[in-house]
């Protein structure tokens, strides 16, 4: 705790050294108040435990860009109001979709990635 207080006072002191107007205008009372404020805040600066959790929903953003400029087909993807310009023929759709991959596809990709790796001591195998 003493180290944190000392570090916060050092930061305040270095800020006062680089700002001449601040160091000229600060009296002893302001320095003591700043030090007291830093000492009061220091216990609250301790790190909080991380609240991150793995999202197991297997959802990923799916971005689809529609560009119907110059196309004779009537666009049916958008149901909103028209702007009256070429922007009526363009749209970006963003959806959160569930990603599904079969175990066999995953095994094939893993094998493909492993074959690309070669270490200093030879090809990568699961026994290395």
From Swiss-Prot:
GO biological process, alphabetically ordered: photosynthesis
Pfam families reported for this sequence: Phycoerythr_ab
Subcellular locations according to the entry: Plastid, Chloroplast thylakoid membrane
Predominant localisation class: plastid
Keywords: Bile pigment, Chloroplast, Chromophore, Electron transport, Hydroxylation, Membrane, Photosynthesis, Plastid, Thylakoid, Transit peptide, Transport
GO cellular component, one term: chloroplast thylakoid membrane
Entry membrane topology: Peripheral membrane protein
Post-translational events: Contains one covalently linked 15,16-dihydrobiliverdin chromophore.
InterPro entries: Globular_prot_asu/bsu, Phycoerythr-like_a_sf, Phycoerythr_a, TAT_signal
Transit peptide, UniProt annotation: 1-52
UniProt keyword Oxidoreductase present: no
Residue numbers binding 15,16-dihydrobiliverdin: 71, 73, 77-78, 93
PROSITE patterns the UniProt entry points to: TAT
Annotated positions of the 5-hydroxylysine modification: 56
Region spans: Disordered: 70-89
Quaternary context: Heterotetramer of 2 different alpha chains and 2 identical beta chains. The subunit composition could comprise of any combination of 2 out of 4 different alpha units with an invariant beta unit.
Additional notes on this entry: The light-harvesting system in Cryptophytes contains phycobiliprotein complexes. Unusually they are composed of either phycoerythrin (CPE) or phycocyanin (CPC) but never allophycocyanin (APC), with only one type of biliprotein being present in any one species. Unlike cyanobacteria or red algae these proteins are not arranged into higher-order phycobilisome complexes, and they are found in the thylakoid lumen.
Job of this protein: Light-harvesting photosynthetic tetrapyrrole chromophore-protein from the phycobiliprotein complex.
UniProt record similarity statement: Belongs to the phycoerythrin family.
Official protein name in the record: Phycoerythrin alpha-3 chain, chloroplastic
Organism name: Rhodomonas sp. (strain CS 24)
């Amino acid at each position: 705790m003493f180290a944190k207080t000392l570090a916060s006072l050092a930061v305040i002191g270095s800020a006062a050294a680089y700002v001449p107007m601040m160091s000229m205008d600060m009296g002893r009372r302001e320095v003591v108040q700043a030090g007291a404020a830093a000492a009061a805040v220091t216990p609250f600066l301790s790190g909080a435990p991380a609240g991150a959790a793995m999202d197991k929903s297997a959802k990923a953003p799916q971005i689809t860009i529609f560009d119907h400029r110059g196309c004779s087909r009537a666009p049916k993807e958008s149901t909103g109001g028209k702007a009256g310009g070429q922007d009526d023929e363009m749209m970006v759709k963003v959806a959160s979709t569930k990603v599904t991959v079969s175990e066999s596809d995953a095994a094939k990709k893993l094998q493909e990635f492993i074959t690309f790796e070669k270490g200093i001591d030879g090809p990568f195998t699961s026994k290395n």
